[in-house]
Regions:
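Extracellular calcium-associated, cysteine-rich motifs in secreted modular proteins
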Residues: 1-178
Length: 178
């Protein structure tokens, strides 16, 4: 901004005639000085998506719909606002999980763990759901099925949180455990 001469073509300068140089829906002034919201986030007025997470800065700064009071915003300077290893863009558009909560479904497993540790199914390609605490709806939460391994000769076998009846014996997992 300091080395910008009026009328000069310079990709590093904000526009003198356009209040939103990068076209992200937030004025250059709000991006530089911070929009008056809970977090007062700033972002680069020359970058449509400062953190390269797939969400434009204007959306991240103004779309504050997370948290108990729907007043939490994703951070336009951090592609993973909650630090769960899933980008904000993927949480919103791919997994429908909360980019401001590391464990959206409160089942004791982080969203990142649920979508990256896909160890179920014949090809070990099935994951638990980051938005359903009981992915198979069998009455046992995913964390209980994963961490309470009480079957087999050495009590080291677990029920599958993706299957209603892991051993296919006609008795559901919840009934067998209870």
């Amino acid at each position: 901004i300091n080395n910008c001469a009026y009328g000069e073509e310079n990709d590093e300068c904000t526009s003198l005639v356009n209040q939103d140089s990068d076209g992200d829906g937030t004025s250059d002034g709000d991006e530089v000085y911070g929009l008056n919201n809970t977090y007062n986030y700033t972002s680069d007025p020359m970058e449509w998506d400062t953190d390269n997470d797939g969400l434009n800065d204007g959306l991240e700064i103004t779309n504050c719909v997370y948290g108990e009071d729907d007043d939490e915003c994703t951070d336009p300077n951090n592609e993973d606002s909650d630090g769960d290893t899933i980008s904000d863009d993927n949480e919103i558009y791919s997994y429908y999980s909360n980019p401001m909560d590391t464990d959206t479904d409160d089942d004791g497993l982080s969203d990142g763990t649920e979508v990256t540790n896909c160890i179920y199914g014949e090809n070990d390609n099935l994951c638990t759901s980051p938005i359903a605490p009981d992915s198979d709806y069998d009455g046992l939460s995913d964390d209980i099925e994963i961490f309470n391994c009480i079957y087999g000769e050495d009590n080291d076998e677990c029920t599958d949180p993706r299957e209603l009846d892991t051993d296919n014996d006609g008795v559901g997992d919840e009934d067998e455990i209870n």
